[in-house]
Amino acid sequence: MNNFLLDFLALGAVLSGILVITSKNPVISVLFLISVFVNVAGYLVLLGVGFIGISYLIVYIGAVTVLFLFVIMMLNLQLTELSAVGNEYTKNLPLATIIGSLLLFELVSVVPSFDGFYQLNSTTTIFKFLGVGILNWFNSLSLGVGNTFAFAEVNQTFNTFAADTQFANFLQIQSIGQVLYTNGALWLIVSSLILLLAMVGPITLSMNKKDSSPANQVNTVNRLVK
């Protein structure tokens, strides 16, 4: 039953992702994007990575998609304008097919512990590989979160030279925090600077640069007085 739910959620996420980019109505597209995040969150929870699954619901659905809806409503797009350019989607199908084939080839070539194309013989095999193989690969990394399954304590194996991690057991969220603020502290600071630039950059680019010279200010005051 658990494997069936994993396959169902993975298939739902893939189909919702396809509908996100094929829907002509931006509001409907955002709703399908919410469906993608819900399916992925459920998939992660069933795999045992409950904290990251709940974070998907809080961060992506609670903040990102709401921001998308706010921007779409603020732009006030007309459905007639969207339907007028809807026929142009079919012109890019050959290019989309080529890019999709290249991405599939890269996925099969780069992802480890994959023996060949012949394993893609069923939907269950594909999603089982994507769900278990990739997760085990990330768990084997030195900066990974190990076997951090929900509702179970895990041994801390990230910093083997620290004495306090040799005799302590950590929950999933404690394990992630241990890695994030010790081994990945530098990358956390770098990512925060990148997010700061991403926030300040659009504001700076969209600012209306006006002439603030004293002469211009005097002319503005004179126009207001008149």
Swiss-Prot record:
Q: What sort of enzyme, by top EC class, is this?
A: translocase
Q: What name goes with this protein?
A: NADH-ubiquinone oxidoreductase chain 6
Record flagged with keyword Mitochondrion: yes
Task: List the subcellular locations.
Answer: Mitochondrion inner membrane
Q: What does this protein do?
A: Core subunit of the mitochondrial membrane respiratory chain NADH dehydrogenase (Complex I) that is believed to belong to the minimal assembly required for catalysis. Complex I functions in the transfer of electrons from NADH to the respiratory chain. The immediate electron acceptor for the enzyme is believed to be ubiquinone.
Q: Which is an annotated GO molecular function term of this record?
A: NADH dehydrogenase (ubiquinone) activity
UniProt cross-references to Pfam families, sorted A to Z: Oxidored_q3
Q: What is its EC number?
A: 7.1.1.2
The parts of the chain that form a coiled coil are none
Q: Which residues cross the membrane?
A: 1-21, 27-47, 52-72, 94-114, 126-146, 185-205
Q: What is the topology of this protein in the membrane according to its UniProt annotation?
A: Multi-pass membrane protein
The record's similarity note reads: Belongs to the complex I subunit 6 family.
- Record's Gene Ontology CC terms? mitochondrial inner membrane
Q: Which reaction does it catalyse?
A: a ubiquinone + NADH + 5 H(+)(in) = a ubiquinol + NAD(+) + 4 H(+)(out)
Going by the UniProt record, its keywords in alphabetical order are: Electron transport, Membrane, Mitochondrion, Mitochondrion inner membrane, NAD, Respiratory chain, Translocase, Transmembrane, Transmembrane helix, Transport, Ubiquinone
Query: What InterPro entries does the record tag this protein with?
Result: NADH_UbQ/plastoQ_OxRdtase_su6, Nuo/plastoQ_OxRdtase_6_NuoJ
